[in-house]
Structures are given as C-alpha cells and as structure tokens.
Amino acid sequence: MKKKTKVLQELIHDGKCHLRPLVAIPLQAQMAEALGYEVVGISGAYTAAHILGMPDAGLITMTEMVENAKRVCDATTIPVIADGDTGFGNAINVRRTVKEMIQAGAAAIFLEDQVAPKRCGFVKGKEVIPLEEAVGKIRAAVDVRNELDPDFVIMARTDARTAVGGSLDEVIRRAQAFEAIGADIIYVEAVQGRDEVKKVRKSIKCALAASAWDMKPYPTLKEFTDLGLCLTLGVMFFEAGLIADYEMLKNMKEKGLEYWYEWREKAQSHPASWQRIYDMVGFPKVREWEEKYLPKEQLDKYDKSGGLYEPR
C-alpha cells in the first residue's frame, strides 16, 4: 500500500481540484472514506468546539490537536490534512508540531501566519505576523519534512488578505516567499473573488488552495479546477449534523419520547443507522479476530446471549 503522503502528493498534482470535507472525529473520516472521498481535513475550529466546547481562538493545545489527529488518521486509510494553527509558538515550536503530526500519521499540515493567539479565519480581528517571522516558521516545517518524510505535504496558509492592513499584494508577496522556501501548497484564506484567485495562481508555480466564502456565487468543483486549485477548503459538512442534532433535541423536548421512537423506526434502513455504524467502526472485524484467536468454546457466547445486533 502506498504511503498516505505519497498518495496526497499525487492528488495535489493531478490537475484536478479535490473535495476535502472537514472532520473532527474518526467516525466522520470513516464515513467520508466509505463514500469514496480521497482526502479529508481536520478542522481546528470544529475540534476545539467538539472536544473542548471552546472557540477557535488559540485555546486548544498542540497536544490536544495531535492526539485527535492520531485518532482520525488511525481510523482511515485515506490521507488526512491536519490543522497546525500557528504552529503553537515560534519556528522552534513549529519543528516539534510538524514532527508530532508526521508521527501521528497525517499526510499534511497547514500552518498559518496569524499572530498568537490566533482566531478562526472567518472571524474579524485577525492580525498576521511579519513576513520574515512567517518565513522562518515555514522554513522550519520544510526542514522537518525533509528530515522525516520528503512526501509529507506542507501547506502554508496566509490570512493577509483580510487581516489588519491586509491586501492582495501582501498575499502574493507571502505566497511567493513561502513557495521559494519549499512549501508544497499555498493556502489563501478569505480571497475576495475569482479575479484574485487568478492573480495569485499566476504569481506562483506550486499547488494552490483557497477558501471560497467570499466568492459569490460559490464556485463549482469544476470551476475550482479551472481556476487552478488543487483542494477545496472549508467544506464543513458537520454543520448539517449539528443542525440535525439540534432539531432532534428540540423535537424530543417539545413532543416527547414518542417523537424519538417514531423517528427511530424510520431510520432503521439508513446507511448511517446505528447498526451500520457498528459495522463501519469495526465490530465485524472484532468477531473475525475472535474466531481466529479465541478458543472455540468462547465463541458460544453469540448463541447463548441476546442483543439487537450481531457482528457478521
């Protein structure tokens, strides 16, 4: 089997833009893989909200992000792009962050040029560090990549477009500097329209990714490809799940437990029903291992016990 880093290198250089859903938990990555997605990203914002109940404001630690990344990477065979925030310190800290993410099994990391504490790229109040300091951080990341796995993908993100004092010229200046020291992908946050994407694309030769929140109407995947992008950014599909959670809780509160029972009966055949989720996370594999490794008499438990689900 090819290394995940090698697979991702091939994806970002195949001339197509790939849809990259953002996840925070292993099960979401497993769902994405089961549905045929080729790559997933870990959202720092969603991870902070999911495991801490806190905003994406520089409050989550490197250890928490790495531990979560390892769980996601272990659960899927497709490449995972990890969120490295600002590297959790200066260029020296970046070295350790990149090393830890490589050891966790990530295929890539993106590092941004915001000041610390940083904030979600969609939130007002962003500031960026001086270019020289940002270059030092990306250089540190590239050095660790070259030492440990030359195929590991370094995605250098700049928030300079909508940060205090930001401009497209500053975005291009930073993109060119990051490319010159070995970044594999330039990631531009909050690019303001298709014309700006085209200008950035013409200014660099390496792979390019850009968020689409300020591009109206929103581009199709084909248009992203035509614009020369290699990955979509910020496909936060988990919003749909959170809305569904909210509606379920609201309806149970207002209509009682009967609402849950009725909904549950209708959901039995859905590909994401709890029985199918048990299949997805590996109960059948556990039974396969039991049959391979355990004494035969211990397998009688399946015939001598009851339950709503039997792994097969």
Model regions and ranges:
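A residue-identity detector for tryptophan
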Residues: 213, 260-263, 274, 289
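Shared catalytic-loop signature of beta/alpha-barrel
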Residues: 227-272
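A general boundary/transition motif marking the beginning of the first structured unit of a protein
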Residues: 129, 237, 277-281
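Intrinsically disordered, low-complexity regions enriched in Ser/Pro/Gly/Gln/His and often acidic
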Residues: 178, 253-256, 282
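Short, isolated positions within intrinsically disordered regulatory regions of eukaryotic proteins
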Residues: 182, 264-267, 278, 293
